[in-house]
Amino acid sequence: MAMFLRKTMSLIALFASVFLHLNAAAQVLPQPDSGSIDRMAHFASQHVDARHVDIWRPPNFEALKAAGQRFNVIYMHDGQMLFDAQTTWNKQAWLVDKTITRLMQSGQIAPTLVVGVWNNGKYRHSEYFPQKHLQHLSPGPRQLLLENALQNKPQADAYLRFLVEELKPAIDQRYPTLKGPANTVIMGSSMGGLISIYAMNEYPHIFGGAAGLSTHWIGGYEANSHIPLAAYVYLRDHLAPPQGHKIYQDHGTTELDALYAPYQNFVNQIIRDKGYKDQGVQANFMTRVFEGTGHNEKAWAARLDIPVLFLLGQ
């Protein structure tokens, strides 16, 4: 097992190094097809490293603001990858502006802002791996995870304090937001999906909904059991109550997503066992499988409307 863990965690470290290039390549302000970007550059924190935060405003933001409109807010991780493929390391993007604009203009969601929080490059895994999952790992696997993936610096709890105690108050002060959990949701993909669910569990009074696209429950980049089992124990004990909360989960079937089905199915059952309903008009849980799709921004962009509608549809 030790050899397997070292190999797996080495792959994680290699994958994380890609995001160093991502940070270097994405310094240019994104140019969305609709709406506009405000950048809070090098937003300082007492809890984690400073980073850019890109806030997307819809095309008619100023007119809506003048009319007294208040806005839903979606907090999204990996903020470098959300708006403009020309500024990303792999020339792919979620194209969030297109989806949100279309849903707003069709009246399916109320006016909405998107807060894109940049990841922290080499510390992405440290910030996005739910810290309390570590408590449910045996000493050997926990130490290997700490050394090889988290760089002996687990930061997920600090990252959430940054979001909740520093960033959200700044956003609420700067923009006419709807501040309550019913209008404040959080989402991401892969490790970003993992930290989104963790955020709602740890701060259920802040986030009323969480979405994980291709959520990376497996921890490493090969099938394994110890890291998912730690997540299951945490979810069993700490999942946000179903009253007033919504959860969205999905995965594809190719690339890294080809590993996800058994782990996601187990998570789905835990969520149902905790009282969430995925049937009927009162459904507060949705889980989907997208055949033939992989682990990339193009795939997530193509289905972004589904979680947004589920979490914020009116």
Where are these regions (language model features)?
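Non-catalytic cap/lid and distal C-terminal segments of serine-dependent acyl enzymes
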Residues: 27-314
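Bacterial N-terminal signal peptides
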Residues: 10-21
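Sec/Tat signal peptide C-region and signal peptidase I cleavage site
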Residues: 22-26
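Bacterial N-terminal signal peptides that target proteins for export
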Residues: 1-12
